[in-house]
Structures are given as C-alpha cells and as structure tokens.
Amino acid sequence: MVKIRLSRFGSTHNPHYRIVVTDARRPRDGGYIENLGHYDPRKTTETYLKVNTERAAYWLAQGAQPTQTARRLLKAQGVKVA
C-alpha cells in the first residue's frame, strides 16, 4: 500500500519533515517514491509548510492513503482529501 507520510530530517532538537509518498512497509526515514514538500513544526520561517498540491492530488487519485498528520497538512494547503 502506498502512503503519504512524514519523514524526519534535520538535526537534534531541530526537527524538519519531508512530506513523502512511500510504500507502507518502508521504514520512516527509508527511501521514498516522491517528495511532495516539507514541514517545519517550529515555524521558524514564513514558508514552514510547502506542498506540491498538484502532485499530492495526483497521488491521492492513485489511491495513496495519507496518515492523520499528513492529511491535516494537506488540508491546510487546500488539497481535497477524502
């Protein structure tokens, strides 16, 4: 099953996350199919959340299942999530 979820990167005590499309069996920070954007939970910049909405909509149409957090972030960017 293909999932849209967060993959952590950044340094200790300074988390950043990639919003990625990956196989559900892969580890959290393992390889991914496509990078859809990034998220900074500390909101240190104006662009703390950036998502390629066209590609996100494409993957959702292909049947990718977003995690609860990814769903919330996609909705915040205006992506229609069922």
Swiss-Prot record:
Gene transcribed to yield this protein: rpsP
GO cellular component, one term: cytoplasm
InterPro entries: Ribosomal_bS16 (IPR000307), Ribosomal_bS16_dom_sf (IPR023803)
Domain of life where this protein originates: Bacteria
Protein name in the entry: Small ribosomal subunit protein bS16
Swiss-Prot/TrEMBL keywords: Ribonucleoprotein, Ribosomal protein
Entry annotated with the keyword Ribosomal protein: yes
HAMAP family in alphabetical order: Ribosomal_bS16
GO BP terms: translation
Organism: Deinococcus deserti (strain DSM 17065 / CIP 109153 / LMG 22923 / VCD115)
GO molecular function terms listed in the Swiss-Prot or TrEMBL record: structural constituent of ribosome
Family: Belongs to the bacterial ribosomal protein bS16 family.
One Pfam family hit: Ribosomal_S16
Keyword Ribonucleoprotein annotated: yes
Gene3D superfamilies: 3.30.1320.10
